[in-house]
């Protein structure tokens, strides 16, 4: 990811209208790659094919739920995840965050708020990637390239 706008975003929701609305707004905001999936199986396939930099996940999906999907994908990657769900109970939010989600936004939502949260998560991931890329490890020796 050269900039946050080069990031690949995976959007998972079973509502085709919401997929279109959010995808259009992400692209209008400058994000170049938005992959969509309407169920867990398609999401796993898209994740494997595109290796996204951010996931936006619904919870209620036709072939499972976003909680289980996140649990599965977390075994492969620590990509930032944001739940976008109509489930607004405190227990759901806490459970999702406890699984490792980085954020949780309930529907209905303000599009500008979603875009700001996406921007924040991608900026944080980008900064982390930059820090990692500036550390070189060879065997037992680690060199911080920022100090070199």
Pin down the residues of each PLM region.
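Acidic, metal-coordinating helix/loop segments flanking the phosphotransfer/catalytic sites
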Residues: 36-54
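The feature encodes the CheY-like receiver
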Residues: 62, 89, 107
